[in-house]
Amino acid sequence: MTLQQKELFQKSPLLLENGETLSPVLVGYETYGTLSASRDNCILLEHALTGTAHAAKHFESDAPGWWDDYIGPGKTIDTDKYFLVCTNVFGGCSGTTGPSSINPKTGEPFRLQFPGFSIKDIIKVQRELLEQLGVTRIVSVIGGSMGGMQATEWAIDYADITDSIINIASPLAAGPDAIGYNLIMRMAILNDPDFNGGNYVGQPEGGLATARMVGMMTYRTSELFSKRFERFTVAESSPAAFSKEHFQIESYLQYQGDTFVERFDANSYLYLTKAIDLFDVTAPAKDDLPAFAKIKIPYLLIGITTDQLFRIHDLRRGYELLKEWDVPVTYHEVASEYGHDAFLVEKEVPKFEPLIRSFLSNLPVKSI
């Protein structure tokens, strides 16, 4: 079974955190394994900023997924045991309603008329989908990077049906480094003449590619770049040519930018990075307590010491805050030359897999 879609919020519109409403909402998702008769063996997997619902292959000739090494019979997320659901996030561009979707009121794409939204709104859509799928309990919500933010929000908003959380490389609030990088990336898009106020034809390729190049510099480490590229040059290149890549690192970044514009929408990039910036569960809720104080379920937090996007001191601070408020948190750190993206890299599976497998296997009996 590959990408499926469901239309939600047809009778009652989606009420967003900012008070705006939207109806209907189309959600793209993929599932792995079988929902049990008791409907309580679900694991919800959250993708990162530019990921998709295609987390793993469904058959041998299928396109690779972004977490193939963790998903399947006998693997960490054992599909003989669990029913795994992975959605394309609300506001994205891979099968779920977002800025590039058609506005039913105008017959034209929403573009920048799409309502602003938060991480909380993203998981509200997921909650509605799981209800439509018949899921009554979730064994664990697992996510890395922006996916970890979604997982954390699940522990706050829907702890009544969620048994545990696994958050990889995501703080309790976006730090100034991440906010600053996101601003630079958005400005690259907004200042591209082809952006045209969001009403572009095709893509604002230069701006979006530049944004991706900036992002790639935060997803990996200087150690990895030094080892892979040093100051190696591209054959037959001219050091005086500004329009051509002279160094191999330039060629690598240009390739990352060029391929990215073929698969991701610039407006979605603006909205999603802003949602990341605004994520902050340390802020007081209506009861004047920090939002994360509501978390009472087992919570696995994994920090990456070499992370250049979400710095390890922010993860450590998050762990201390969770402990102070008696959240049942387990914390581990992983070192990797791959930095923030380490949890997505096949070579690094042995560092993360035992931590995730052990956490899932040690959940209370009711959760498995």
UniProtKB/Swiss-Prot annotation:
GO CC aspect terms: cytoplasm
Entry EC no(s): 2.3.1.31
Top-level taxonomic group: Bacteria
Catalytic activity line of the entry: L-homoserine + acetyl-CoA = O-acetyl-L-homoserine + CoA
Residue positions of the active site: S145 (nucleophile), D307, H340
Pathway: Amino-acid biosynthesis; L-methionine biosynthesis via de novo pathway; O-acetyl-L-homoserine from L-homoserine: step 1/1
One matching Pfam family: Abhydrolase_1
Enzyme class: transferase
Residues reported to bind substrate: R212, D341
GO MF annotations in UniProt: homoserine O-acetyltransferase activity
InterPro entries in alphabetical order: AB_hydrolase_1 (IPR000073), AB_hydrolase_fold (IPR029058), HAT_MetX-like (IPR008220)
UniProt-annotated location(s): Cytoplasm
TM regions (residue ranges): none
Family: Belongs to the AB hydrolase superfamily. MetX family.
Protein name per UniProt: Homoserine O-acetyltransferase
The species this protein was found in: Listeria monocytogenes serotype 4b (strain F2365)
